[in-house]
UniProtKB/Swiss-Prot annotation:
Mn(2+) 1 binds at residues 41, 108, 119-120. It comes from the Viruses. The lineage of its organism: Viruses, Riboviria, Orthornavirae, Negarnaviricota, Polyploviricotina. Phosphorylated on serines and threonines by host kinases, including human casein kinase II. This is Polymerase acidic protein. GO terms for biological process: cap snatching; DNA-templated transcription; symbiont-mediated suppression of host gene expression; symbiont-mediated suppression of host mRNA transcription via inhibition of RNA polymerase II activity; viral RNA genome replication; viral translational frameshifting. Belongs to the influenza viruses PA family. Keywords: Cap snatching, Endonuclease, Eukaryotic host gene expression shutoff by virus, Eukaryotic host transcription shutoff by virus, Host cytoplasm, Host gene expression shutoff by virus, Host nucleus, Host-virus interaction, Hydrolase, Inhibition of host RNA polymerase II by virus, Manganese, Metal-binding, Nuclease, Phosphoprotein. Its main location: host cell. A motif (Nuclear localization signal 2 (NLS2)) lies at residues 184-247. Plays an essential role in viral RNA transcription and replication by forming the heterotrimeric polymerase complex together with PB1 and PB2 subunits. The complex transcribes viral mRNAs by using a unique mechanism called cap-snatching. It consists in the hijacking and cleavage of host capped pre-mRNAs. These short capped RNAs are then used as primers for viral mRNAs. The PB2 subunit is responsible for the binding of the 5' cap of cellular pre-mRNAs which are subsequently cleaved after 10-13 nucleotides by the PA subunit that carries the endonuclease activity.
Amino acid sequence: MEDFVRQCFNPMIVELAEKAMKEYGEDLKIETNKFAAICTHLEVCFMYSDFHFINEQGESIVVELDDPNALLKHRFEIIEGRDRTMAWTVVNSICNTTGAEKPKFLPDLYDYKENRFIEIGVTRREVHIYYLEKANKIKSENTHIHIFSFTGEEMATKADYTLDEESRARIKTRLFTIRQEMANRGLWDSFRQSERGEETIEERFEITGTMRRLADQSLPPNFSCLENFRAYVDGFEPNGCIEGKLSQMSKEVNARIEPFLKTTPRPIRLPDGPPCFQRSKFLLMDALKLSIEDPSHEGEGIPLYDAIKCMRTFFGWKEPYIVKPHEKGINPNYLLSWKQVLAELQDIENEEKIPRTKNMKKTSQLKWALGENMAPEKVDFDNCRDISDLKQYDSDEPELRSLSSWIQNEFNKACELTDSIWIELDEIGEDVAPIEYIASMRRNYFTAEVSHCRATEYIMKGVYINTALLNASCAAMDDFQLIPMISKCRTKEGRRKTNLYGFIIKGRSHLRNDTDVVNFVSMEFSLTDPRLEPHKWEKYCVLEIGDMLLRSAIGQMSRPMFLYVRTNGTSKIKMKWGMEMRRCLLQSLQQIESMIEAESSVKEKDMTKEFFENKSETWPIGESPKGVEEGSIGKVCRTLLAKSVFNSLYASPQLEGFSAESRKLLLVVQALRDNLEPGTFDLGGLYEAIEECLINDPWVLLNASWFNSFLTHALR
């Protein structure tokens, strides 16, 4: 950090900062973040003053430095950066000549035009928090406060920003540049977190020792110590604090706080249109597995060997044909692609030794399906600056889609138990430290509830597919590699099992940036007839490829076997998150843990054992049109896990927006249920922000429908 400061700031500023730290007995080799903060503050004070003069008529003017008029009177007197004695001498002199009231603390500047002292603040936290700390410390009407943040926000007394917009923009740009430079060197996080609040020196009852440490530990985020939190709370007017805050932000804002009553909220409007379609990267409830138990074949664990072994377990293959075409695709190409996979797998089996990986021949059907040579040619921007009508592609607005019942069915299925164990105990991670016995017990109970869950199967399937695809994308960039979609599990009896869901063929994958896309064709086995819900399969071409004999209570029966084929794409960053889907287990475990903690604090003893072993007790799971659904603690665990998994599988900007905006409405409704008499302003704007996210995503539409059920029952 010290090297960065010396490179980034003017030597004069660095020298002044060194003097200031020496004056306060601080070591800049140790307090490097403070060194950077002092330099930043000095530079902002100097930039605030630069180019601002007062002419003979007493008007404020902005003049560049090399202008001959620079002999005009400077508008600002700089106090910051002087040693304490000299600074107080300047302040006293100003007070004597202008009649200004002497401030309690040394300000940063004096404004000769407005006749007031100015306190400049530069914060890495929220501007309003820092503003209130400053105001509480100064406790003076006569010192004007102006706060800047590294994110481009600012706040000033009575929203009077003193300088013209261009001068302030210069300061904000410089702060943003400093932040970027720090981030590039990996220094920003440490710098951001090191900011302490304003220290106020007042005589008050002292809290010391253990109580003091406990007080400091139990503060809300963004507060470094009890004093800062006190200052923040003291700065709030009990009445009208929202209006006050808004008026500080802008003179134009005039918000009327409306009471939020049971009759106030309306349901969220879901879009009309054709039903939404399946958009996950792989099939969920409709997937079919070809499996081998206790695999012990040669090359066991090598995906291609495992896949061929699984394919050999099925004998009902037949000449494939299309049963549900893709509306916009060249469907024969999908059919030819599957035939090519079968033929090339047959070729491998005829070889003496099976290779570890298989690169497909670059046939016309695969080139079409993988979008080979379809991307528009990239041209350097500098080469087309002179083109007068240069513009971005016209892109159509996405078509609005309505909620369809299949997504609720998918979710219900994800919460169900399967007859296999998908995670071992150590999937959540061993205890790193000698952690309490309680934590291990909770983890073991939770794992027992979710290890058989279908959502856990989706996690392991997602981790495998994304890992295999990312590896292939890096190792075989130019090849059309065949990637089997595999998962591993154990039967109830503990026997190992390898499952094949189908295949992926990846396209060219020169992935330089995190968001660069690799195309792939997925081919997945299923027993679901696509003609039952054709809208769900809009993006797929579905083939019938065989007949499967199934054992049932009434004997054997034959069912047609389908292959769901589609072109898809993903990116490095999406695959990276897909590989980390196990985090969903951790997230849902933490949610369960907070429920146990709440119960334990009421009973004043650890309730983990009772929580999981009392099978008669039911817990709220979620809302449905019928009301609050309840179930066993195991069902709660599996539902929370399924929600977390679906958030990962259906991650999208629509989901991000809906979650963030609907949460605001949820908090207001919760406040109403807790009889806190909440008030709102611009509720219509909040609804608009929520409904803007409801376009065509099935998971977002389902969440919006659940939210409406919650509103109905919460406000009865």
